[in-house]
């Protein structure tokens, strides 16, 4: 609850190994020191730290299933902490600053998260809530095992949020927010739910592939540094881009609809099908933009979309082309 307090954490890592001749190396870059021991298959072992890696000796590892337990302090570099809420943002390779992991997008795993938070806080993550448990002045939020995802798509949001629920949509979506204007909430939450449902319907029809994850919820955050982030099952948005004022222009409404369609499209392009490394991040972004345009543009016939595309993209493209060293798309 106090943003200055450290956050004690515990990792239980279950994995299968074929090679036990070499030590196991986990990515970890903490600003709170490093664990010097852990439990491997029930036996306490020393852990060595070298160049942002935890090195677990091969002696207690075995072929097949292994269980590794490490107690540590969660890193602060990707914990965006505010007075009444916090949220993780681990893209591109910052999961290692939060917890020990294999921090690369082509290694996917399932996650079972438990967050112990103040009683008046809500918690959102990429899988459904299994149960809540009272723990003194705090509440434990235990979530179901997630779908297989890359580390950069793991996330949680915790804080003093109001939660709106949509039973009209097929997926019973939830919206976490801190908006205090009751009129704005009443007028806009329905639009947000509808546009997410329309985006899911369109993507399912276009790809002939059902929504690939357990759920689709979202949180709006007034301190979010990006327009949105496509965390699996728990999208994050900058609050001001979704909760528009009554005086919002058609272009602002178009931008909101495209943002929602873009982040929803990432559930297929990026989250289900993922690039091997971030040198190809451009590909998932291009697909998401392409799908957002196809879905949303027809809903705003009064806007000249060709002119809008020209104004938004051509000046920046020409500026790069005129420079001495244009950057390659794949970096």
Question: How does the language model describe each region?
Answer:
Residues 143, 176-331:
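Hydrophobic alpha-helical and helix-loop surface patches within well-folded domains
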Residues 1-214:
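Acidic/His-enriched low-complexity segments
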